[in-house]
């Protein structure tokens, strides 16, 4: 990547990480896909979500198959061309986070700061589960001819996809 591409890559990645929600793609035990939207926060390279155990099919899917994909996409109202919207896809492995784990309280505080009072309500609901989504290989698309492959924590090694 050129220095200009590296700078644009870093700026656009950070901009997408400011989104309030992500698209979560999971599969059930029969391999049927499901896409849904959920609020998130990040801590380091990892993403954290809180979803209902009983009401959300994607919760059951993550418990049955920990491999998933998340999508962060540029707001339609901010892009000039919907075919060239900035977007970042990340393949992730989901891990449950116990309420007894010290990171649970840290992440709940981050969620409350980002998403407001609803998080306080969720904390008291026993059926809500926190998942840590650990990224593996990822792709950032910034427009036509501007796709980059990278791995978590290795942004400096991002590769411009030309074929």
Model-derived features: positions:
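Catalytic micro-motifs at enzyme active sites that drive phosphoryl/nucleotidyl and oxygen chemistry
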Residues: 26-27, 38, 59, 77-81, ...
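General beta-strand recognition
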Residues: 48-49, 69, 139
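C-terminal edge-of-domain segments
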Residues: 6-9, 110, 118-163
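Surface loops and adjacent helix of pleckstrin homology
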Residues: 53, 73, 143-145
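Short connector loops at helix/strand junctions that flank enzyme active sites
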Residues: 19, 35, 43-45, 63-67, ...
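Short, structured beta-strand-loop surface elements
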Residues: 57-113, 135
């Amino acid at each position: 990547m050129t220095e200009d591409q590296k700078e644009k890559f870093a700026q656009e990645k950070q901009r997408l990480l400011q989104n309030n929600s992500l698209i979560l793609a999971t599969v059930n035990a029969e391999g049927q896909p499901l896409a849904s939207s959920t609020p998130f926060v990040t801590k380091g390279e990892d993403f954290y979500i809180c979803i209902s155990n009983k009401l959300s099919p994607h919760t059951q899917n993550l418990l049955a198959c920990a491999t998933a994909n998340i999508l962060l996409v540029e707001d339609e109202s901010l892009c000039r061309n919907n075919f060239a919207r900035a977007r970042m896809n990340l393949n992730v492995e989901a891990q449950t986070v116990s309420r007894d784990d010290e990171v649970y309280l840290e992440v709940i505080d981050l969620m409350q700061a980002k998403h407001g009072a609803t998080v306080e309500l969720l904390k008291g609901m026993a059926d809500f589960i926190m998942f840590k989504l650990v990224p593996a290989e990822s792709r950032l698309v910034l427009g036509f001819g501007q796709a980059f492959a990278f791995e978590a924590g290795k942004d400096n090694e991002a590769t411009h996809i030309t074929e």
